[in-house]
Amino acid sequence: ENAKFFLGHFPIFLYNNAMAEQEEQFFKRRALTEAGAAYSVGAVLPVLASLLIGFIAALAAGEGYSSAAWYRFLAYLLPQICFAAAAIVFFRRSKVSVRGVYRGCRWYYFPVALLLQFGLMFSLSELNNLFVGFLESFGYTNQTTPLPPLDGWYLLPALLIIAVLPAIFEETLFRGILVGRMSASGWGTAATLLISGALFSLFHGNPAQTIYQFICGVCFALLVVRAGSILPSMAAHFANNALIVILTSTGYGTEGGWVMPQAWNIGLIVSSAVCLAASLVFLLFLDKSNARKGGVRDGKYFFFAAAVGIAVCAVQWIVVLITGFTA
């Protein structure tokens, strides 16, 4: 009797199981497609918004609008608003859980994140300075976006716009959505790190920082994959940007400002390199959490949706490169 019941219901069980697998696969592909679309939205929307705001500002404030304090703050705020919009669209369309993106992790990933960021900020940036010098030897002029005023009470909104908001919204887009969907779709760890790092670097559109941003993107993605959470990378991102803002506000590295003594600078670079090496040894060799071998499963869905954003970022990168050599 039990055998007849089992044989009679076994086909139904197989059918239901197959349908559940198909639904899960459809959800993963849809979420991966929406992640690619989020990258495109995050790349295109700031360009369109900045052109519109620049046009309106030029009409209202005249030619000198770009040097005004309010416009410099707005130039840093606008991309974060666009990233937030891209994330909202993603969560609404993909049905991915917001809580899943911001879930917690083991406590020790936070000190690892800070050590990693300390290593990236000083030792790796020193290597990036050498790369910039190499480009400048061929006549390249490195163009940087000027910071808003940092004196007095300006420091508080600067920390909010330059440190807090990017730590939330950039990490949500690049690590929470992109890295999260790549991992959830069965991409191999190496593929996830390299592709997300390349997209992160290309997105910033600065040829002089291409290698630096790529390595940072790979390291942040590795941290997120191991931790299973973007919270440690958010903490590292905030620490990096906040320290830059605070140091710059004191005059460090600015024209006419103070310069760190050479002995201090050497000690800082060496200690930073040690921290970077130690954190990478832990994340690469001692911690194997969420490690996965494999390629780019269903990658065509992601890249098709991300193609517009990749094209826009590539054009910006090329324009900046040409401008740097012709300026």
Predicted segment positions?
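Alpha-helical transmembrane segments of MFS and MFS-like solute carriers/permeases
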Residues: A37-V41, V112-L116, I161-I162, S196-L199
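Short helix-terminus and kink motifs of transmembrane alpha helices
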Residues: S50, G54, S125-N129, R175-G176, ...
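Hydrophobic alpha-helical membrane-insertion segments
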Residues: A43-L48, P111-S125, V225, A235
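Cytoplasmic juxtamembrane interface segments
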Residues: A85-C105, A198-I215
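Juxtamembrane helix-loop-helix connectors linking adjacent transmembrane helices
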Residues: A61, Y65-Y71, S97-P166, G180, ...
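N-terminal, membrane-interfacial amphipathic/helix-forming hydrophobic leader that caps
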Residues: K4-V101, I244-A327
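Transmembrane helix-loop-helix hairpins at the membrane interface
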Residues: L155-T326
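Membrane-helix interfacial "entry" motifs
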Residues: F26-A31, A35, G64-R72, V101-Y109, ...
